[in-house]
C-alpha cells in the first residue's frame, strides 16, 4: 500500500504539466537551466484524456526509477529555493511514445541548457552525449555501469563506475587484504562472464598478482561441485564471476553449507548484490559475503534524515536510493553551475558540494591519448556477516 501511495503521488506530480516538464524557483529572469532526462514512461501510464491506464491499486514497478529520481530532484530544487538560487529544471521523458529523445532535444525551446542530468540506457546515452558534445553542454549520467562505447567526449561524466573499474577494484581489494590466500572464481558460461574474466586477468597480469583459478559451473551446480575446488587445510577466497544475482545467491547459500563442514571460505561479488537484503537470512550465515558498490549512503547525515522524514510524514514510505541520488546530483551540479557558470566544463572532476558519499571523478584517457570522459572511481566495500551488513572501506 505504501508503494502504491508513493507511485500515484509522484505520477500525479508529473502529469500536471505538459511536455517538456518545467520546474523552477521563484527567481530572477536570468537562471541556469538544467535538463533532467529520465525514463518517466508517462505515455504508458496515462491516456490522452489524462486517465490512468492501470486498474485500481495496481503497482507498476517499472515506472519507479525515473519517478523516484524526479522526486529527489524536486526536493533538491526546493532546498535550493530556500537559498533563492536561480535554477530551472527542464524535464524530458526519454521514453515518450510520440517523440524520441533526440527529437525532443532538437525541438527544445527557450535558452540553451547549461547542463544535462540523465538516467538512461546505453543507446540513449550515446544520443544525449553526442548532443552535449555538439552543444558544449556537460552531460552527467547517474546510473550506467558502462560508457556506452563513447570516446573523445570531455563533457561526459559517469557517476556510476564502469564494470571494468568495479572488477579492478575488487581484484585490488582481494590482493591487498588476502595476499597469500587461494582465489577461486566460480562462474557461469556467457559473453559477459568472459568479459569480466578478461578484466581480472588483464589487471592481475599487469600487477603480477598470483593467478586465479576459474571454474565454470553447470546451471544445477551442487555443494560437491564447489567442495572439489576447495582446500580443507587453508582458507579460500571465492569470487562470483558473474552479474547474475540468482547465481550469486545460490553460490552463497551452498558455500555457507560448505563452511559448516571442513572448509573455511569467504565470498566476494559485484554491485548487483547491493539491492539484495536476502543475505540477512539464515541460509547465508556462516560465511562473510563482501561486495563493492559505487553508491553507499548510511543515511545518518542531516539531509538524508530530512528526506526520510518527508517521505514518512507525506508519502508514508521510505525513500529509495534513487530518490537520494536524484537529490545529490541536482544539488551538486546546480551549485557548481552557480559558482562557475560558463566555466562549469573545467570543474567536472570537482569534489565540491558532495552530500551523501565521497566520489573520485577521474579523467579516462583512451587509446588515442585523448580524454574520453570522466568517471567516478570511488568504490565502497560492504560485508554481510552473520546477517548484518557493514561498511568495511
Please provide the spans of the model-predicted regions.
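Hydrophobic membrane-targeting signal helices
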Residues: 16-18
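Extracytosolic ligand-binding ectodomains
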Residues: 2-12, 21-393
Amino acid at each position: 500500500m505504501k508503494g502504491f501511495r508513493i507511485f500515484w503521488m509522484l505520477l500525479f506530480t508529473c502529469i500536471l504539466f505538459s511536455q517538456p516538464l518545467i520546474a523552477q524557483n521563484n527567481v530572477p529572469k536570468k537562471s541556469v537551466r538544467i535538463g533532467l532526462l529520465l525514463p518517466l514512461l508517462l505515455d504508458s501510464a496515462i491516456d490522452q484524456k489524462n486517465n490512468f491506464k492501470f486498474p485500481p491499486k495496481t503497482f507498476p514497478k517499472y515506472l519507479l526509477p525515473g519517478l523516484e529520481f524526479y522526486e529527489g530532484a524536486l526536493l533538491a530544487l526546493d532546498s535550493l529555493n530556500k537559498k533563492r538560487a536561480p535554477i530551472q529544471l527542464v524535464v524530458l521523458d526519454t521514453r515518450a511514445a510520440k517523440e524520441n529523445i533526440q527529437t525532443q532535444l532538437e525541438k527544445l525551446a527557450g535558452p540553451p541548457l547549461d547542463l544535462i542530468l540523465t538516467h538512461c540506457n546505453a543507446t540513449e546515452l550515446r544520443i544525449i552525449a553526442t548532443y552535449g558534445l555538439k552543444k558544449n553542454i556537460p552531460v552527467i549520467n547517474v546510473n550506467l555501469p558502462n560508457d556506452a562505447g563513447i570516446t573523445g567526449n570531455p563533457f561526459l561524466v559517469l557517476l556510476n563506475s564502469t564494470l571494468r573499474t568495479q572488477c579492478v577494484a575488487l581484484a585490488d581489494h582481494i590482493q591487498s587484504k588476502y595476499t597469500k590466500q587461494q582465489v577461486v572464481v566460480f562462474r557461469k558460461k556467457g559473453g559477459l562472464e568472459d568479459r569480466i574474466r578478461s578484466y581480472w586477468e588483464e589487471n592481475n597480469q599487469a600487477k603480477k598478482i598470483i593467478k586465479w583459478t576459474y571454474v565454470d559451473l553447470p546451471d544445477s551446480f551442487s555443494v560437491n561441485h564447489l567442495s572439489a575446488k576447495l582446500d580443507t587445510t587453508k582458507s579460500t577466497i571465492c569470487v562470483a564471476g558473474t552479474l547474475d544475482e540468482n547465481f550469486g545467491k545460490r553460490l552463497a547459500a551452498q558455500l555457507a553449507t560448505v563452511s559448516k563442514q571442513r572448509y573455511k571460505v569467504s565470498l566476494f561479488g559485484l554491485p548487483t548484490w547491493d539491492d539484495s537484503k536476502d543475505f540477512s537470512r539464515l541460509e547465508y550465515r556462516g560465511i562473510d559475503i563482501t561486495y563493492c558498490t559505487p553508491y553507499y549512503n548510511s543515511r545518518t547525515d542531516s539531509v538524508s534524515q530530512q528526506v526520510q522524514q518527508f517521505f514518512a510524514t507525506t508519502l508514508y514510505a521510505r525513500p529509495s536510493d534513487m530518490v537520494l541520488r536524484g537529490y545529490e546530483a541536482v544539488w551538486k551540479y546546480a551549485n557548481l553551475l552557480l559558482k562557475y557558470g560558463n566555466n562549469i566544463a573545467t570543474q567536472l572532476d570537482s569534489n565540491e558540494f558532495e552530500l551523501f558519499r565521497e566520489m573520485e571523478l577521474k579523467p579516462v584517457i583512451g587509446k588515442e591519448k585523448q580524454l574520453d570522459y570522466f568517471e567516478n572511481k570511488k568504490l565502497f566495500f560492504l560485508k554481510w556477516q552473520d546477517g548484518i551488513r557493514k561498511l568495511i572501506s
